Amino acid sequence: MPNYAVIDLGSNTIRLVVYEVKDDRRKTYSSKDFKSLINDKVMAGLSAFVADDGTFTDDGVRRAASVLKGHAKRARYFDCKRIDVFATAVLRNAANSAEAVAAIERESGLAINLLSAADEAHLGFVGATCDRTIERGTLVDIGGGSTELTRIEDGRDFDNVSLGQGSLSSYAAFVRAILPTPEEMDAVAGALFERLAALSDRDAYRTDVVVWQSGPQRP
């Protein structure tokens, strides 16, 4: 059975997962078709390498490339058929996005798939519905640098929106110590509510069914 490596290059962590796939010729899968052989993450904190002018710094490029090379080395022990790298908000929103991605690719030797906000939201929906059907509701994916909302109707994903506020960016903007104070938590919530209020189609995401996804929602 072939092995595939996936590397998620996020604002906070860079995660490697190597999957053993029962049959890679199929078009549809459930989680039973995959076996995780390794699940390893590095707290890279890439959002800290975004300068005041919005550019991703050279130090950030070196940090990202170093972690990617380490993950690729581990993946090759498993004789992976492919190694796919996906990047999200931290590089997507950088003022020098294309240049930063190209620099990381040169230094790491790996190609990077830079996901649009819409692609990120859709892939989150695909993962959430791999083993179950969600007929309606709003899928909420809180990452380090952004939050994606996806409207689900009749078991399909429709509208989606990316809010430029995630767990790590909220921490950097509002929290001074290790743990947030009640006032700081109110400030984080207030900033998020302002972003939601600015959405012209915010009513489309109102629902009594909320599906949470990704790390910050885990206990």
Regions found by a protein language model. Give the residues of each.
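Active-site-adjacent helix-turn-beta-strand microarchitecture at beta-sheet edges
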Residues: 144-147
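Nucleotide/phosphate-binding catalytic cleft detector across ATP-hydrolyzing
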Residues: 1-11, 17-139, 150-219
